[in-house]
């Protein structure tokens, strides 16, 4: 039995997906995600009745998004990730910087290099949401819809919120200490 199941979202926005792959739609992605979630929840109910009942994908589900192929902002991507993490069985969202492999299809953008720093910043922001309880709007907002490629998202937040510092680590709550750049779990 599989430990985790993954359904690939591919492109974060339905309109962009239609632009690059008109034959695909997000419904064909979200429907299987729903089936997996239903299977996990039914399995959990069955285990309440029968302790040795087999677990269905015990590590939950994951998905992946390609970033940089279309014009979505990091804010759009992180809001989608946050919504996915709100599902009871979603454990991990992976981000993959777009790499042009088919240069003959005019629908696909021709980038000089993959957006690897952006991909890394999205992983850092994802970590802040999952383990540090940051909200999307604390990481990116309308005035800063994309992550700063020069500094990590936690430092960028700290620079935008000087009123939060200094922090007395002997008296501050754990959650506040975790927001200090350089301190982590």
Regions found by a protein language model. Give the residues of each.
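Conserved alpha/beta core segments of nucleic-acid transaction machinery
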Residues: 142-173
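Conserved AdoMet/S-adenosylmethionine-binding subsite of the radical SAM
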Residues: 1-139
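Short, contiguous strand/loop micro-motifs
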Residues: 67-68, 109-112, 160-164, 174-178
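Helix-hairpin-helix
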Residues: 167-185
